[in-house]
Amino acid sequence: MDELNKLMGDLTGYEAPTDYANLYISNAQDPSKVSNYVRDLDMRTALATVNYDYEGVHYTREYFNSYPDNIMAVRLSADQAGKISFDTNLENLINGTAYTNTVDGDTITMRDALSTNGLNVEAQLKVINEGGSLSTGTNGGNPAITVSGADAVTLIFACGTDYKMELPNFRGEDPHKAV
């Protein structure tokens, strides 16, 4: 058994997969005034879309996830200029031992470490606006970015850890550079 323990190494690197963050996109639209709401998933392109009308404006949300790039892209657009306005923020779900959540210009960066095994996790949300303006503040106590009067906006969400499938401790490089 001692030989097996030597081969296995320190087992503190093990942990079950877990969700790290919620991405919130909040607007001031009254849901009771939304019409023609349609959700769609194109299996050929892996593009999920939401289309709806609100107070005479047609809105489109497009979602795409890329496993090789470890990103999710969200595009929000409208058929009239200057109609995209919302707040966005990240919420930490793991409540680990090294939590930080900051906003700098167009990017929110959230870091933490799992309390059970010290796995480092980082998520970044970049907001790319076409027209309108960006400002920073807080939403529910979390750093937030507010988009006002944009023609369209693309959100790029990336998340990574220092997990590495390699004995003995299953740890690799800090995730910051990769994210």
Question: Residue locations for each model-derived region?
Answer:
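Aromatic-residue-lined binding/catalytic grooves and analogous aromatic/hydrophobic interfacial grooves
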Residues: 1-179
